[in-house]
């Protein structure tokens, strides 16, 4: 991902204030509610029968934290996202058979959640930088697909 120095500062500055557990759980939960067909990858998580069940599900929250921890690692390697996410790309492609479009959807949901959490601090410039990052991460995660 090519970011200007200003964009990198905006992304890392805001990310330093992110509660990975809260934002990760909310982002994954929203993905599962807004795009219910994504729930098929999480059948082992138990009750996903309603929006409140999804948003209150501890396994959704835990996996959301795991997802955002990996995203956080990617922010430290913006110049090598494909390398950073190579193993996760392989896992999601070969073993889990996740549709790579879901990575793009989750990235967009993450941007919504960040905007919700940070309000006025999530300026159009910050959003623009984050859109580049989530697109880059989605592309890196889709890299191993044939």
Curated annotation (Swiss-Prot):
This is Hemoglobin subunit beta. It comes from Loris tardigradus. Involved in oxygen transport from the lung to the various peripheral tissues. Pfam families: Globin. InterPro entries: Globin, Globin-like_sf, Globin/Proto, Hemoglobin_b, Hemoglobin_oxygen_transport. One of its GO terms (cellular component) is haptoglobin-hemoglobin complex. Heterotetramer of two alpha chains and two beta chains. One of its GO terms (biological process) is hydrogen peroxide catabolic process. The modification N-acetylvaline is found at residue 1. GO terms for molecular function: haptoglobin binding; heme binding; hemoglobin alpha binding; metal ion binding; organic acid binding; oxygen binding; oxygen carrier activity; peroxidase activity. The keyword Metal-binding applies. The modification Phosphoserine is found at residue 44. Residues 2-146 form the Globin domain. Keywords: Acetylation, Heme, Iron, Metal-binding, Oxygen transport, Phosphoprotein, S-nitrosylation, Transport. Belongs to the globin family. SUPFAM superfamilies: Globin-like. PANTHER family: HEMOGLOBIN FAMILY MEMBER, HEMOGLOBIN SUBUNIT BETA. Heme b binds at residues 63, 92. The modification S-nitrosocysteine is found at residue 93. Red blood cells. The gene is HBB. The modification N6-acetyllysine is found at residues 59, 82, 144.
């Amino acid at each position: 991902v090519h970011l200007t120095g200003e964009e990198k500062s905006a992304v890392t500055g805001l990310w330093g204030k992110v509660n990975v557990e809260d934002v990760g759980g909310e982002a994954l939960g929203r993905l599962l509610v807004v795009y219910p067909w994504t729930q098929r990858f999480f059948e082992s998580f138990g009750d996903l029968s309603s929006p409140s069940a999804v948003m209150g599900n501890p396994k959704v929250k835990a996996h959301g934290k795991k997802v955002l921890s990996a995203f956080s690692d990617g922010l430290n390697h913006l110049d090598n996202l494909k390398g950073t996410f190579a193993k996760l790309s392989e896992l999601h492609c070969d073993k889990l058979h996740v549709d790579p479009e879901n990575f793009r959807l989750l990235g967009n949901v993450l941007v919504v959640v960040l905007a919700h959490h940070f309000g006025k601090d999530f300026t159009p410039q910050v959003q623009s930088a984050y859109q580049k990052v989530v697109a880059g991460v989605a592309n890196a995660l889709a890299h191993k697909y044939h």
